[in-house]
């Protein structure tokens, strides 16, 4: 076995290996960070930070994308019950359009860390981008399948965002947010083409911006004819 990646692809990966490395380097209060919602055409990007007791095992916790919705909901409660601290940060659609999705994601991650009731001593972050915070940290590609703390954060972020999109489905019917959660499903693209974008759509994203109402000259502007005015 070499590092975290076993020579036998069927061998299980030690989801506590990264946490163990940080502990051996003298870091304590380790928090895993992940996000949900970078790719959708609508809604927020949600980040979560989870700090687990050292050595805690959480059977079933893995990359949230590999779990069923029912399993994620079940583990969401388990993580909240077993974790030392859980924090959530949200970058709404307006922030995404204002500063771009990467910067909105990092902002949400920073807010999630700040929301922790215990100040972390080390951050394990899914992805390749550091969070602009004065806390020792390590980025991990595919971290939600390599670190238990990051995997737990991915579940918290995913369930939190999914619940928000179900609420938005009731607020903006016709788009199917409860089913596709704002991602670019064929039914979602068809709804945008038919109804036009709604207020929570990301207006800088392809698939949405093409359907924004044109901005007429102020001298010739008449009443808005779209379903939603911006």
From Swiss-Prot:
Keyword Secreted: no
One Gene Ontology term, aspect cellular component: ribonuclease H2 complex
Enzyme class: hydrolase
Major place of residence: cytoplasm
Compositionally skewed regions (Polar residues) per UniProt: 215-230
Note describing how the cofactor binds: Manganese or magnesium. Binds 1 divalent metal ion per monomer in the absence of substrate. May bind a second metal ion after substrate binding.
Assigned EC number: 3.1.26.4
Record keywords, A-Z: Cytoplasm, Endonuclease, Hydrolase, Manganese, Metal-binding, Nuclease
GO biological process entries: DNA replication, removal of RNA primer; mismatch repair
Named cofactor requirement(s): Mn(2+); Mg(2+)
Alphabetized GO MF terms: manganese ion binding; RNA binding; RNA-DNA hybrid ribonuclease activity
Residue ranges of the region described as Disordered: 209-230
Catalytic activity line of the entry: Endonucleolytic cleavage to 5'-phosphomonoester
Family classification: Belongs to the RNase HII family.
Database matches in NCBIfam families: PRK00015.1-1 (NF000594), PRK00015.1-3 (NF000595)
Function field: Endonuclease that specifically degrades the RNA of RNA-DNA hybrids.
HAMAP family in UniProt: RNase_HII_B
Protein name per its UniProtKB record: Ribonuclease HII
């Amino acid at each position: 076995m070499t590092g975290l990646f076993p020579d036998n692809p069927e061998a299980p990966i030690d989801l506590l290996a990264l946490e163990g490395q940080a502990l051996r380097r003298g870091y304590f209060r380790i928090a895993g960070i992940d996000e949900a919602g970078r790719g959708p055409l609508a809604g927020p990007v949600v980040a979560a930070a989870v700090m687990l007791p050292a050595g805690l095992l959480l059977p079933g916790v893995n990359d949230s994308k590999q779990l069923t919705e029912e399993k994620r909901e079940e583990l969401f409660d388990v993580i909240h019950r077993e974790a030392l601290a859980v924090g959530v940060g949200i970058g709404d659609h307006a922030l995404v359009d204002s500063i771009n999705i990467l910067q909105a994601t990092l902002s949400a991650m920073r807010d999630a860390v700040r929301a922790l009731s215990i100040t972390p001593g080390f951050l394990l972050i899914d992805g390749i981008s550091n969070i602009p915070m004065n806390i020792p940290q390590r980025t991990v590609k595919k971290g939600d399948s390599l670190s238990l703390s990051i995997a737990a954060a991915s579940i918290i972020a995913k369930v939190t965002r999914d619940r928000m999109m179900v609420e938005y489905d009731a607020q903006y019917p016709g788009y199917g947010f409860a089913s596709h959660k704002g991602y670019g499903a064929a039914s979602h693209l068809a709804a945008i083409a038919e109804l036009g974008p709604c207020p929570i759509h990301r207006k800088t994203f392809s698939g949405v911006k093409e359907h924004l109402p044109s901005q007429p000259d102020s001298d010739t502007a008449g009443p808005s004819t779209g379903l939603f005015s911006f």
